[in-house]
Regions:
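N-terminal domain-start signal
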Residues: 1-177
Length: 177
C-alpha cells in the first residue's frame, strides 16, 4: 500500500522497484532534480551561497564513490546526495581506473574537489587518510570562499564545519597512525 501511495506522488516517476533501496533512490533522484534547479533560480551572492552548501553533498558523494570502488560495490548501490554535479558525472568518476582518474573526471567540469583530491593523493593512498584529508581541505577551501560573501550566518556555519572537520580528522588520523 505504501508503494502504491508513493507512486502517486512526485516520487512516482523515479520509483523503479519495490524494495527499500528503490524507494531511497527515487527520493534522492527526485530531490536531486528539485535541488539541482536552485542555483539557476538565484543570482549573485545567493547563487554562490547555494553552490557552497551543495558542494558539501559533492564531498559526501566523492567519499562514497571512493569507498564503493575500494570495496567492489557497484555504482548502483551508491546513494548520491543532490549536489552540483549530475549523476552521469559521478558514474564517469566511478568508472575511472583509480582515484587519480576520478580527480581527472571531476576536473573536466572544473570542480574544486578535483584539485583537493589530487593534492591529497600526492600525500597518501590510504583510503581512510584520503577521506579525512580530503574533507579537511574541502572545508577549509569552502570556508575561504564564504569569507568573500556578505552572509555572516553562512560564514559562521562553515567556520563551525571546518572546526568540526579538523577535530574529526585529528581523531581519525590519531586512530589510524
Amino acid at each position: 500500500d505504501f508503494l502504491r501511495l508513493l507512486s502517486e506522488t512526485v516520487y512516482g516517476g523515479e520509483l523503479a522497484g519495490q524494495g527499500l533501496p528503490d524507494v531511497d533512490r527515487a527520493v534522492l533522484r527526485t530531490q536531486a532534480k528539485l535541488v539541482g534547479d536552485l542555483p539557476r533560480l538565484v543570482t549573485g551572492e545567493a547563487r554562490e551561497a547555494v553552490r557552497l552548501l551543495l558542494l558539501r553533498n559533492d564531498l559526501h558523494n566523492l567519499q562514497a564513490l571512493l569507498r564503493a570502488k575500494a570495496t567492489g560495490r557497484p555504482f548502483e548501490e551508491v546513494l548520491l546526495l543532490p549536489g552540483t554535479l549530475r549523476e552521469e558525472v559521478w558514474r564517469q568518476a566511478y568508472e575511472a581506473q583509480d582515484p587519480a582518474g576520478m580527480a581527472q573526471v571531476l576536473a573536466v567540469p572544473g570542480h574544486p574537489l578535483a584539485r583537493a583530491l589530487r593534492a591529497v593523493l600526492r600525500e597518501t593512498q590510504d583510503l581512510a587518510r584520503v577521506e579525512a584529508l580530503l574533507a579537511k581541505r574541502f572545508f577549509e577551501d569552502v570556508a575561504k570562499a564564504a569569507k568573500g560573501l556578505d552572509q555572516p550566518a553562512l560564514r559562521d556555519y562553515l567556520a563551525l564545519e571546518v572546526d568540526a572537520e579538523n577535530l574529526r580528522t585529528a581523531f581519525k588520523l590519531q586512530g589510524s597512525g
